[in-house]
Amino acid sequence: MAIESSEPMNCFINYGVLFLLTFALEVFGGSEDTQVLVYDARVGFLSAGTLEVNMTLSKGRYELFGDVRTSGAIERFFRWRGKFAAVGFMVEEMPRTRAYLLFEERKNSRKVTLAAHGKTTIHRLSGVSREVEYPQGSDLMSVLFLTDHCFDAAWVHDGEDAYEVVRTASRQTFVKQGKTHFRGSTELCRYRFNYGKAEQRGLDVWLGLHRDRWVPVRIRVRVPFRPDALLRLRTPG
């Protein structure tokens, strides 16, 4: 059951910094392997923005930071920016989230979601905050960017709600994405994303070898009756 509070929202930045100092920095101090991935986004035929992911793996632990922002033609319709951070452990080659932070900003609203210690706290610009039960599984961003193989099924969450992801097919393929994006052999993982009680989406992830690690080099989200969303990994030209 949600717990609501009328606490003022003047703690946005401090709350995020507290999270990073408490959880992420203890992993960063032992960093042995850090990688930065930059993706260009499209929705249908429209340029939609960029996603930057910074991830560090060290002795079975990980930290993940990301920045998503819209730009280009899509901003004629909407504008959105998000930052996320996650820390956790790798268990049987899959990430297990210990804590997850998401900051979202739209034209007239801001929202901070912090999932840690068995509960999720959600803050809004309106000054109303609430607590909900920690969702099942690991956060979607950790599973998406730190899993280097096609998995059969997993529960993922956005800090607030949990969703089941089930593999429907996989195969070897070769992708060509232009001179400035990844080109090469990949493994295509096709998933069914159970989003809500009756809604399903398609999630296609192409895994390719980039700087000695298998990472998503192309990601496509398929939503019925809507244009596909596509992410393509940038590579040096």
Where are these regions (language model features)?
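Bacterial N-terminal signal peptides that target proteins for export
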Residues: 6-16
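N-terminal signal peptide c-region/cleavage motif recognized by signal peptidases
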Residues: 24-26
